[in-house]
Structure formats: structure tokens, C-alpha cells
Amino acid sequence: MRLMIMFDLPVATSKDRRNYRRFRRALIDEGFLMIQYSVYVRVCKTKKSAAYMEQRIATVKPPTGIVQTLMVTEAQYQSMHFMVGTEKQDIRNSADRTVMI
């Protein structure tokens, strides 16, 4: 299961930029990886753990802008096609069941 966070936040004022930085930092601290600008994804073991993570992110959401979440299965995530560009080869973004470090 993957939890995807997509957001579009205002950056017109210094307060807006501060809110943006805090939200982005909170996502990274929770283990999310950036797959595109303003699109972050995290692996969750179950739908219940993804819902829990969604609740945690809701506590740090900025007061303005748009923040959306999407839960997708591993198969759905792996069926994503790249029309332009290539996939980031990050071990944390791997679909492998076992990762040897």
C-alpha cells in the first residue's frame, strides 16, 4: 500500500513560505519521498496504517492551499508509466519484498 500526498500551497508571503517549508519538512520526517515537485509517497504496510499516517499528516497541514491524499496498492503504484523522464532508483522506493543492505 502506498500513501500519496499531492499539494499546491501558496508562497506569496513569508508566512506562506514558512508554512510550505514546515509541511514539506513534516512529510520528509514522516518518511515520505518526493516523486515529483509537490507529490510525495510513502510505503505503508496496510490500509489501516495508511489511514493512520493520513491522520498524522492532517495534524500538520497548512492553513491554506490544497492538500490531497491518495491510497494505492503496490500493484497500482508499480503500473505507473513514465512518459518523460525516468524513475528514481531509491532503495526506499523499491517494491521488493526483501532488501539486502
From Swiss-Prot:
InterPro entries: CRISPR_associated_Cas2 (IPR021127), Virulence_VapD/CRISPR_Cas2 (IPR019199). One of its GO terms (biological process) is maintenance of CRISPR repeat elements. It holds the Pfam family CRISPR_Cas2. Its cofactor is Mg(2+). Signal peptide: none annotated. Keywords: Antiviral defense, Endonuclease, Hydrolase, Magnesium, Metal-binding, Nuclease. CRISPR (clustered regularly interspaced short palindromic repeat), is an adaptive immune system that provides protection against mobile genetic elements (viruses, transposable elements and conjugative plasmids). CRISPR clusters contain sequences complementary to antecedent mobile elements and target invading nucleic acids. CRISPR clusters are transcribed and processed into CRISPR RNA (crRNA). Functions as a ssRNA-specific endoribonuclease. Involved in the integration of spacer DNA into the CRISPR cassette. This is CRISPR-associated endoribonuclease Cas2.
